[in-house]
C-alpha cells in the first residue's frame, strides 16, 4: 500500500482513495519474527513456516525495492538473512532444488541483504540447470517449459551489479569475489539514469 499511496501522490491521481489506503495500512500488522529469529512467512500463529516451499513471499520487501521498514531495523534485517539462509540450507542439499522463480526470489532477497555468495550460488544453479540446449528456460531442472527466469536471470545479474532508488545509486552492492574484473554499459536505472 505504501507504494500505491506514494505513486498516487507523485502522479496526483486517486487522491480520494489515499485516505482509505492509509487507513488500511494503519491496520496491517508489522513484520514478525518466528521462534528462530527468522522473518515469519505467515502471521497466523497456527501456520508454521515451510522452508521447503518454492516461494518466498514473506521476503517481498527485498525483491525490487528495499522496504524501509526492513532496511532500518537490525532485527528484521537479521531475520530476513536467517530466512534466506534457512531456505538455502534445503536448496543446497538438492543443488538448487525445484522452481527457478523461487530461486530468483531468494536471490533478489540475498542481493538486497548484500549476501553475494548466496546470490552467486543461485545464479550458478540457474545458469547450469534451468536451461535446455536450445536456450529455452525451465521451471524445474531441465524440464517443464517456463519463461520466469528469462527476465529473472538478467535482472539478478543487474541487482548484483547496481541498485538504485530515488536519491541513491549503489554500485556493486552484491558483487561476488568470483567476479574479479569486467565492465558493463547501457544500464538503465530508476529515474531514467543511464
Which residues does each PLM region occupy?
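Well-ordered alpha-helical scaffold segments within catalytic/enzyme domains
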Residues: 1-14, 60-72, 105-114, 156-165
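Alpha-helical packing segments of well-folded alpha/beta enzyme cores
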Residues: 3-4, 24, 102, 122, ...
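Extended glycan-interaction surfaces of carbohydrate-active proteins
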Residues: 10-97, 121-135
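A structural signal for alpha-helical segments
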Residues: 13-19, 101, 142-148
Amino acid at each position: 500500500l505504501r507504494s500505491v499511496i506514494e505513486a498516487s501522490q507523485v502522479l496526483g491521481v486517486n487522491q480520494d482513495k489515499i485516505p482509505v489506503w492509509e487507513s488500511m495500512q494503519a491496520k496491517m500488522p508489522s513484520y514478525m519474527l518466528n521462534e528462530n529469529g527468522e522473518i515469519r512467512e505467515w502471521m497466523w500463529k497456527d501456520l508454521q513456516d515451510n522452508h521447503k516451499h518454492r516461494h518466498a513471499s514473506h521476503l517481498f520487501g527485498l525483491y525490487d525495492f528495499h522496504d524501509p521498514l526492513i532496511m532500518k531495523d537490525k532485527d528484521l534485517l537479521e531475520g530476513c538473512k536467517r530466512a534466506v539462509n534457512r531456505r538455502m540450507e534445503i536448496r543446497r542439499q538438492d543443488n538448487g532444488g525445484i522452481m527457478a522463480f523461487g530461486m530468483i526470489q531468494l536471490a533478489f532477497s540475498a542481493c538486497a541483504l548484500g549476501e553475494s555468495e548466496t546470490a552467486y550460488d543461485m545464479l550458478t544453479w540457474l545458469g547450469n540447470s534451468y536451461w535446455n540446449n536450445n536456450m529455452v528456460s525451465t521451471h524445474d531442472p531441465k524440464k517443464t517449459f517456463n519463461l520466469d527466469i528469462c527476465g529473472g536471470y538478467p535482472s539478478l545479474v543487474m541487482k548484483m551489479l547496481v541498485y538504485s532508488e530515488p536519491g541513491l545509486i549503489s554500485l556493486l552492492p552484491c558483487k561476488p569475489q568470483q567476479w574479479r574484473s569486467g565492465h558493463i554499459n547501457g544500464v538503465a536505472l530508476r529515474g531514467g539514469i543511464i
